[in-house]
Design a protein with these regions (language model features):
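A glycine-centered beta-loop-beta connector
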Residues: 21-24, 29-45, 86, 94-109
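Short beta-to-alpha loop/turn elements within the nucleotide-binding domains of ABC transporters
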Residues: 12, 41, 60, 77, ...
């Protein structure tokens, strides 16, 4: 899980958001107005809802392509719960909440790293 997830304002251009994601090395940004989380924009959203539409990426905003509502999971839940929720909802990022407030984000990549680190090897050499 990444604490203090990266955010952008709703009026941020898709081009600017893409550069921000690249610079921060993240696959998602929460769209936030003041203290209110409005939605999430992911690398997949950028491709499917922006680039693939041939719209002007300087004029199209993250508010135009964001996913809302944000799929969230309480911080007390386990990794398997996050895995199951992502599969059930068809998402690759979940907002992680503490008492209902988004405090972090967990991604499929985080799950892969966890499972790689903590699972037993399945193939052995003799």
């Amino acid at each position: 899980m990444r604490k203090n997830p990266k955010t952008v304002a709703p009026g941020t251009s898709v081009r600017s958001a893409a550069k921000h994601m690249r610079d921060e090395r993240v696959g998602s940004l929460f769209v936030k107005k003041g203290s209110l989380f409005l939605g999430i924009v992911t690398d997949t959203d950028l491709v499917r809802r922006a680039v693939a539409t041939s719209k002007d990426l300087n004029k199209l905003t993250v508010e135009d392509i964001m996913t809302t509502p944000i799929a969230t999971i309480e911080s007390t839940r386990g990794v398997q719960d996050a895995h199951d929720m992502m599969g059930d909802l068809g998402v690759r990022h979940l907002g992680v909440t503490v008492a209902g407030t988004i405090m972090g984000v967990i991604s499929v990549r985080d799950l892969l790293v966890y499972y790689q680190r903590y699972s037993e090897p399945k193939i052995t050499q003799d």
